[in-house]
């Protein structure tokens, strides 16, 4: 496929840049990863991983040994550096199969990855490490593209994959990532040696190549083909999302409603932990929340594990008319209280029904995603960035539902499978390793008198402790117009109000 033929993904490969990295496969891996991570249509923030296999001099023997460099635990492909990679002895990873005790003992394998580390400066290996290790290809990409997950999450996903790609893409049914899934990928390849990639049901895509460029191009071509197919199917079964049930007010009116409602929603969501909010009325969000199918699809939840880890099991849909009078804050709170109580009860029931004897304690039962039909989507999290990323992930989920419904029927993960991911002990350990909240975490700070002196110093220091900061200096009449300090901007002011 020629570069100009890509319509639904961005071809960013620069031959001149790649030539500068020629001979350094790890540098080319990082370059490829950054290009893939730069396009949110290819993978979500922090999602997916990439790898390459090279021959290195073994510091223990002086001889050559095969080493796999793979994105480590955490981090984002778009900003990946060498420090974010894990380097492991490939033969040691393969030898772990001898001590693998079966799927009931998956979690113990993660600690054993540490015994396979080649580069002592490595990032901690991720749970996806064996998925790369048991495929023989030099360069491998594992991504979560919306267009492909739409097919992977469709009721007829396996048949659609076979039909669309004419047998050149394999299929592995949904399974929680881990050592056994790596063995399943190897088995799929052994049974289908000529395939160019593998779809993981309700999860994502694996593609590969002999070189960094071949892997990159293969990945783009598969995702492009998926997106083009979906685009050709929209509207054939009927209107998208069953057609529009209501029409949104003008953008200015939507923003007014959002500004009026956001503090109340933040109050509900901050019942246990102080939260920061984000609002979007993106066209994709409006198409979904204004549709006839919202009531059916929203409670189903998401499919891709990355999606519900960021957005919770399902959103809260508000039963408020778009033109609701929100000036009386007390009346609004009384009207919304039952909805939040019902959501918390739903989440608690989900936890009680699905928990295991060793499950971590139930986390905050408040919603992360709140949908206001006609107006937009609110997301709440510990800081502004996390709230924004949660919104991105739910838009990913909307894209997946839209595509799956266009070609088949959307299916979400069963609640028990979702719980097993959300309350996975390995996920809990990752949460426990995160830095503790700072003094003003979850709070919104307003600094006055910040154009100079003490106020300016406070304003510059506060972002280290408070995620959202607004600062201003009022000047006497007749002097220069009011100034905002260098750390402030209109977005921060909007965040303060919302």
Where are these regions (language model features)?
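Glycine-rich flexible loops
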Residues: 1-445, 450, 457, 461
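Glycine- and other small-residue-rich loops at beta-strand/loop junctions that grip anionic moieties
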Residues: 174, 472, 498
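Generic hydrophobic, amphipathic alpha-helix propensity
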Residues: 454, 479-482, 486
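Residues at the C-terminal ends
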Residues: 463-464, 488
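Conserved glycine-rich Rossmann-like NAD(P)H-binding loop of the short-chain dehydrogenase/reductase
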Residues: 467-481
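Rossmann-fold cofactor-recognition segment
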Residues: 486-498
């Amino acid at each position: 496929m020629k570069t100009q033929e890509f319509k639904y993904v961005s071809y960013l490969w620069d031959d001149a840049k790649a030539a500068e990295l020629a001979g350094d496969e790890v540098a080319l891996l990082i370059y490829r990863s950054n290009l893939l991570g730069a396009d949110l249509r290819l993978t979500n923030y922090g999602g997916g991983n990439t790898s390459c296999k090279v021959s290195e001099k073994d510091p223990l023997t002086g001889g050559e040994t095969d080493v796999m460099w793979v994105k480590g635990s955490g981090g984002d492909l778009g900003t990946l550096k060498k420090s974010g990679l894990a380097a492991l002895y490939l033969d040691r990873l393969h030898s772990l199969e001898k001590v693998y005790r079966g799927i009931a003992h998956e979690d113990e394998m993660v600690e054993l990855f540490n015994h396979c580390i080649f580069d002592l400066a490595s990032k901690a290996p991720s749970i996806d490490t064996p998925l790369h290790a048991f495929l023989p290809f030099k360069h491998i990409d594992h991504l979560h593209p919306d267009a492909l997950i739409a097919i992977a999450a469709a009721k007829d996903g396996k048949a659609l994959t076979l039909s669309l790609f004419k047998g050149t893409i394999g299929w592995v049914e949904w399974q929680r990532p881990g050592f056994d899934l790596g063995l399943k990928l190897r088995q799929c390849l052994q049974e289908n040696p000529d395939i160019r990639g593998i779809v993981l049901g309700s999860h994502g895509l694996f593609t590969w190549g002999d070189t960094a460029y071949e892997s990159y191009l293969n990945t783009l071509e598969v995702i492009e083909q998926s997106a083009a197919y979906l685009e050709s199917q929209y509207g054939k079964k009927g209107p998208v999302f069953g057609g529009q049930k209501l029409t949104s007010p003008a953008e200015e009116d939507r923003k007014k409603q959002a500004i009026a409602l956001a503090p109340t929603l933040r109050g509900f969501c901050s019942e246990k932990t102080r939260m920061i909010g984000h609002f979007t009325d993106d066209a994709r969000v409006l198409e979904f929340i204004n549709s006839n199918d919202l009531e059916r699809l929203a409670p189903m939840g998401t499919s891709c594990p990355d999606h519900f880890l960021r957005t919770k099991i399902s959103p809260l849909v508000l039963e408020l008319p778009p033109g609701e009078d929100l000036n009386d804050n007390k009346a609004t709170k009384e009207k919304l209280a039952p909805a939040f109580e019902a959501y918390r009860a739903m989440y608690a029931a989900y936890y009680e029904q699905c928990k295991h004897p060793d499950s971590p304690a139930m986390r905050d039962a408040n919603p992360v995603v709140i949908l206001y039909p006609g107006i937009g989507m609110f997301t709440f999290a510990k800081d502004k960035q996390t709230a924004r990323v949660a919104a991105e992930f739910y838009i990913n989920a909307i894209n997946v539902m839209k595509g799956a419904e266009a070609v088949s029927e959307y299916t979400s993960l069963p609640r028990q499978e979702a719980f097993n991911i959300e309350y996975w002990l390995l996920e809990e350990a990752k949460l426990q390793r995160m830095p503790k909240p700072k003094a003003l975490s979850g709070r919104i700070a307003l600094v006055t008198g910040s154009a100079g002196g003490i106020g300016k110093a406070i304003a510059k220091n506060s972002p280290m402790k408070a995620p959202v900061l607004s600062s201003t200096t009022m000047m006497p009449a007749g002097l220069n117009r009011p100034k905002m300090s260098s750390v402030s901007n209109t977005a921060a002011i909007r965040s303060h109000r919302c």
